[in-house]
Amino acid sequence: MIIKVKGQTYFTSKYPNIIIPEKPVPQLILKHIRSKPDQVLLVDGLTFKEYSSHFVADTIEKVACGLNKLNIKKGDVLGVILPNLPEYVPIFHGTLLMGGITSLVNPDYTIEELSHTLATVSPRYLAVTLAVYEKIKNDLKRVFPSVEKVILVDIAGQTLKEIDQLTLSSDGIVMSFNQLINNNGKDYPIVRIDPKKDTAIIPFSSGTTGLFKGVCLSHHNIVSNTYQTQTIETSTYKKNDTVMGILPFFHIYGLMLFLMLMVKQGHRVVVLPKFEPVRFLELIQKYKVAISFIVPPVAIMFAKSPIVDKFDLSSLRTLFSGAAPLSSEVEDLIKERFKGRLVIKQGYGATELSPACFVIPSGLVKSGSAGILLPNQLAKIISPETGENLGMGEKGEICIKGPNVMLGYYNNEKATNEVIDKDGFLKTGDIGYVDEDGYYFIVDRSKELIKCKGFQVPPAELEALLLSHPKVADACVVGLSKGDMGEVPRGFVVIKQNESLTEKELLDWAHPKIANYKHFRGGIFFIPAIPKSATGKLLRKNLKDFNPPKL
């Protein structure tokens, strides 16, 4: 578990290294799906329509064939701006089958947010719902000048008529998903893919600070993390388990679980476009769901909400919480409510790690721990002050090396070199330690990143927004603890001299420009000056607990 190299301390996994196939994602996934052709793989949680493995595999190849007719080339980007839908699976894997890259973002993003994320990777194609298209159509050519075709995907048969009308009346840039897959699924070339070098997906992450950056993950990155996770999760799943697919597929946590691991293992996934507590619980009851992957706000519902008692949840065995830390108090409340019948598990990771690096093994829970190191990885704990490797039990920045570490940030070598050192270790930005049993503990989350409802909210993004207001001279944003939500943004603003501005005016101006979870639920305060270091760095910690009277 501890190894010494040139006098430096490193930590290995308790698990032996595993053999990870060097294959492209779609080759691996299609093989597993085709092996169980009659098994139900996906269920639409809105219509209850079921999709067999055979149907999903055929549709993946039809997507590839349709994209081939659109002249897709290796390395072309297809931007996915969709909620969780059954069509997500074939769109994702069909694009990769053609050597394309999928870049996935939140469908709730505003035009401004899309311009800072998806637009930066120059997608050639977009897959969107009608609602998203209506939001972006007037700015399409300005924000996405590289886009040649927009593929419209229906939700539960609700917008088919409108989509058909649009495809007839548009200037040819719009087509429906049904038109895309209207083929035999056979006429597409075999594209040569180098699993270790070729990018498969570009999700977005802020890292520990700053604006969002595209994270280039190779085919081998995500295949590796699928196998690494599966290795220590074998006892969690049973052959015919049904799982709930409520985590956003555009988030690396949901993507790896539902587009990779669950599909590979052949579990039935009930897909829900967005989390609605009653519908979520109804579906657990209806389909006898055994495992649900959740975020802390959903865990709090299981712990405290009275509606939970109205449903038969006896089939539920495991809740796996991720994306943000789950407190031991909430975990204990759930165990008490379900009389110890439910297993509560947690893991830890980052988009840059594809995403998992620690997972708590079944039956081996240690309170407060993020888990143990997955196989085929090496960890080191370094001193934030000196950069020296530290020993067991010593607190420092956690750094990870392994086949799941990203290729780098899209077109941003400087940012890549700041987080991946010369030896290939990714600096997580989190402070923690490892104990004598190989369990890792996070004692200080990355200071600047705000985690709201499991989503990353980079303060720098909101500060840039506030600073763009003509009456704002300076701004700083911090996270405020807010119970079920985790943290919410709180703004501090310096008004320009001889100008006047109210909190309501600033909120009314800012909120339409950002996704709902980024709203300033912690309020905005006006102060004389923003505290800064001698080098001009924002001293957020000085404002973290500062609570001045509002003007």
UniProtKB/Swiss-Prot annotation:
Gene3D superfamilies found in the cross-reference section: 3.30.300.30, 3.40.50.980, Luciferase, Domain 3 (2.30.38.10)
Pathway it works in: Phytoalexin biosynthesis; 3,4',5-trihydroxystilbene biosynthesis; 3,4',5-trihydroxystilbene from trans-4-coumarate: step 1/2
List of residues binding (E)-4-coumaroyl-AMP: 253, 323, 346-347, 351, 447, 451
A Pfam family hit: AMP-binding_C
Entry keyword set: ATP-binding, Ligase, Magnesium, Nucleotide-binding, Phenylpropanoid metabolism
GO terms for MF: 4-coumarate-CoA ligase activity; ATP binding; CoA-ligase activity
Residues at which ATP binds: 205-209, 213, 346-347, 351, 430, 445, 537
Region (SBD2): 347-409
BP-aspect Gene Ontology terms: phenylpropanoid metabolic process
Catalytic activity entry: (E)-4-coumarate + ATP + CoA = (E)-4-coumaroyl-CoA + AMP + diphosphate; (E)-4-coumarate + ATP + H(+) = (E)-4-coumaroyl-AMP + diphosphate; (E)-4-coumaroyl-AMP + CoA = (E)-4-coumaroyl-CoA + AMP + H(+)
Region (SBD1) location: 276-346
Positions bound to CoA: 274, 453-454
Cofactor(s) named in the record: Mg(2+)
EC identifiers of the protein: 6.2.1.12
Tagged with keyword Membrane: no
EC class name: ligase
SUPFAM superfamilies associated with the record: Acetyl-CoA synthetase-like
Domain remarks in the Swiss-Prot or TrEMBL record: Both substrate-binding domains (SBD1 and SBD2) are involved in the substrate recognition, and are sufficient to confer the substrate specificity.
Entry's family note: Belongs to the ATP-dependent AMP-binding enzyme family.
Function, as annotated: Carboxylate--CoA ligase that may use 4-coumarate as substrate. Follows a two-step reaction mechanism, wherein the carboxylate substrate first undergoes adenylation by ATP, followed by a thioesterification in the presence of CoA to yield the final CoA thioester.
PANTHER family hit by this protein: AMP-BINDING DOMAIN-CONTAINING PROTEIN-RELATED (PTHR24096:SF149), LONG-CHAIN-FATTY-ACID--COA LIGASE (PTHR24096)
Protein name in the entry: Probable 4-coumarate--CoA ligase 1
